[in-house]
UniProtKB/Swiss-Prot annotation:
It is found in: Nucleus. The keyword Transmembrane does not apply. Interacts with transcription factor HSF1 on chromatin. CDD domains: ASKHA_NBD_HSP70_HSPA1. It comes from Cryptococcus neoformans var. neoformans serotype D (strain JEC21 / ATCC MYA-565) (Filobasidiella neoformans). Keywords: ATP-binding, Nucleotide-binding, Nucleus, Stress response, Transcription, Transcription regulation. This is Transcriptional coregulator SSA1. Gene3D superfamilies: 1.20.1270.10, 3.30.30.30, 3.30.420.40, Actin, Chain A, domain 4, Substrate Binding Domain Of DNAk, Chain A, domain 1. Residues 609-626 have a biased composition (Gly residues).
Length: 640
């Protein structure tokens, strides 16, 4: 039986893990890396995902897509989307109010939704797991930031469907990290644990009580738009200004230069976690100008001061909401690559009167680790370590409906344990009102205009009655994924109307998901065809060059005419290879057959003259075999 996996779908990096042999295995990708960049690139001939995509980003900035998690489930006019677009070299367009990414692939313009890009990263993680487990992987638990709203969760689930995965559960990243921390600490009594999760693009804080395998989230807070990418942006802006000062030139208009600078900034940021100063050296960055500079840790901290400080607000909010004071928090666990920044560690430590945070779990892998444990539990693949484990998570935002005067009336308050169901009775606002419009919002503000509209629907056919008489029962039902279903019923007629919140037309329809799934299959077939073509080309190239080597090493042993015929053919093939950039697999194969037709008789004759072919002739030459003549056994002399 092939197992269900846990996938941490990150803004900048993703990670996949599986529960096997009574423990979690983090699965390395084909490059041997335990995390994979959440990058997808398109070029004239192929699609690249992961390390291969990130490695070529400077050469192909407009068609390399990353940060899809900062777009997923959002509206095009969101302030964050508009701000991010200034930093991205790829083109984001407005498609029916939602952001979509426009790239050039195989010479034509293509538009992808953030769900499709995320699904490509998920496919890469799925293939990584399949290579390791040796079978098809179809079930997964996928993680999201705890502060993701309903539409972002739903869109992530859709991305899983497009990738051909049955998403067993969407779980919150800090909760998954808490499992990684607490799995082996069952017998230690009740503990209050604060998870501080600062990744590449999102930030969450959750406070949990862990006792005997029960992980109960008391409160959660965060910012779905704060992470390492924002620190990189500050560095990039700083150096763009410095370059302008020194050279009177603005490199921000050049996507390739900006990308090379960003890569250097990301590297510098990492170095500054362990060194007090680092240098940046980029040859010919812009207009042929070399850019050599340095930056200290203190300067970096100053550039990001407000962002670093802002991470403390959610910590205070979680302590307030959970009514647990600082001194009662037993452990502070740091998760996410950005928690390696010394200033962040110091701020957290100072917040808890100088206590050192717990560093017992790997900040890059903890989330996938916890997701893998949850995947094992949901598929019944339990063992002693996981059998009594219970997760009780919460809804991150209040959810409710709009009542007269644009007031937000919450039915489910934030930090309510999910799954949960709440009902309330409402009535009509005017006499003989034939129907009501139920508008569903999420958020903490008093007026709905300041909250996020999740969806709306009509309940019609209410019998005429004075205002306030009809009784309309509205029920909110939040499932274990944190996704909301709403039902409204007129108690007198029993008429009801319900929706699964589909984010104000924002959600992909079943048909769209099926179309994207079919497209994903098509892309996969194209990727495989491209790989087969490369293989055919490489095979022909190595065959040609090994023939060439044999010809030049044994010039005197060949028949002169044969030598000339074959040399001419080999040179002809080698020069055609240089011009056959976009040839098909079949073209390479027919060229190989053509070359073999000339080479085989000549090489057979050559080896015959030598007394047998050397073990394995060039390029896997057919008819290879015998040992070289001089080694045909000991020579015997006749003795008188």
């Amino acid at each position: 039986m092939v197992k269900a996996v846990g996938i941490d779908l990150g803004t900048t990096y993703s990670c996949v893990a599986v529960w096997q042999n009574d423990r979690v295995e983090i699965i390395a990708n084909d490059q041997g890396n335990r995390t994979t960049p959440s990058y997808v690139a398109f070029n004239d001939s192929e699609r690249l995902i992961g390390d291969a995509a990130k490695n070529q980003v400077a050469m192909n900035p407009y068609n390399t897509v990353f940060d899809a998690k900062r777009l997923i489930g959002r509206k095009f006019e969101d302030a964050e989307v508009q701000a991010d677009m200034k930093h991205w070299p790829f083109k984001v367009i407005d498609r029916a109010g939602k952001p979509a990414i426009q790239v050039e692939y195989r010479g034509e313009e293509k538009v992808f939704t953030p769900e499709e890009i995320s699904s490509m990263v998920l496919i890469k993680m799925k293939e990584t797991a399949e290579a390791y487990l040796g079978g098809t992987v179809s079930k997964a638990v996928v993680t999201v930031p705890a502060y993701f709203n309903d539409s972002q969760r739903q869109a992530t689930k859709d991305a899983g469907a497009i990738a051909g995965l049955d998403v067993l559960r969407i779980i919150n990243e800090p909760t998954a990290a808490a499992i990684a921390y607490g799995l082996d600490k069952k017998s230690e009594g009740e503990k209050n644990v604060l998870i501080f999760d600062l990744g590449g693009g999102t930030f969450d804080v959750s406070l949990l009580t862990i006792e005997e395998g029960i992980f109960e989230v008391k409160a959660t807070a965060g910012d779905t738009h704060l992470g390492g990418e924002d620190f990189d942006n500050r560095l990039v802006n700083h150096f763009v200004q410095e370059f302008k000062r020194k050279n009177k030139k603005d490199l921000s208009s050049n996507a390739r230069a900006l990308r090379r600078l960003r890569t250097a900034c990301e590297r510098a940021k990492r170095t500054l976690s362990s060194a007090a100063q680092t240098s940046i050296e980029i040859d010919s960055l812009f207009d042929g100008i070399d850019f050599y500079t340095s930056i200290t840790r203190a300067r970096f901290e100053e550039l990001c001061q407000d962002l670093f400080r802002s991470t403390m607000d959610p910590v205070e909010k979680v302590l307030r909401d959970s009514k647990i004071d600082k001194s009662s928090v037993n452990e502070i666990v740091l998760v996410g690559g950005s928690t390696r920044i010394p200033k962040i560690q110091k701020l957290v430590s100072d917040m808890f009167s100088g206590r050192e945070p717990n560093r017992s779990i790997n900040p890059d892998e903890a989330v996938a680790y916890g997701a893998a444990v949850q995947a094992a539990i949901l598929t019944g693949d339990t063992s002693e370590a996981t059998q009594d484990l219970l997760l009780l998570d919460v809804a991150p935002l209040s959810m409710g409906i709009e009542t007269a005067g644009g007031i937000m009336t919450p039915l489910i308050k934030r930090n309510t344990t999910v799954p949960t169901k709440k009902s309330e009775v409402f009535s009509t606002y005017s006499d003989n009102q034939p129907g009501v419009l139920i508008q569903v919002f999420e958020g903490e503000r008093a007026k709905t205009k300041d909250c996020n509209l999740l969806g709306k629907f009509d309940l019609s056919g209410i019998p005429p009655a004075p205002r306030g008489v009809p009784q309309i029962e509205v029920s909110f039902d939040v499932d274990a994924n944190g996704i909301l279903n709403v039902n409204a019923a007129d108690k007198s007629t029993g008429k009801s109307s319900k929706i699964t919140i589909t984010n104000d037309k924002g959600r992909l329809s079943k048909e769209e998901i099926e179309r994207m799934l079919a497209e994903a299959e098509k892309f996969k077939a194209e990727d495989e065809a491209a790989a087969a073509t490369v293989q055919a080309k490489n095979g022909l190239e190595s065959y040609s060059y090994s023939l060439k080597t044999t010809l030049s090493d044994n010039q005197d042993k060949f028949d002169a005419a044969d030598h000339e015929t074959l040399s001419k053919k080999v040179d002809e093939v080698i020069s055609s290879l240089d011009t056959m950039q976009s040839a098909s697999k079949e073209e390479f194969e027919s060229l190989q057959k053509e070359l073999e037709a000339v080479a085989n008789p000549i090489m057979t004759k050559f080896y015959g003259a030598q007394g047998g072919a050397p073990g394995g002739a060039p390029g896997g030459f057919p008819g290879a075999g015998g040992a070289p003549a001089q080694e045909e056994g000991p020579s015997v002399e006749e003795v008188d």
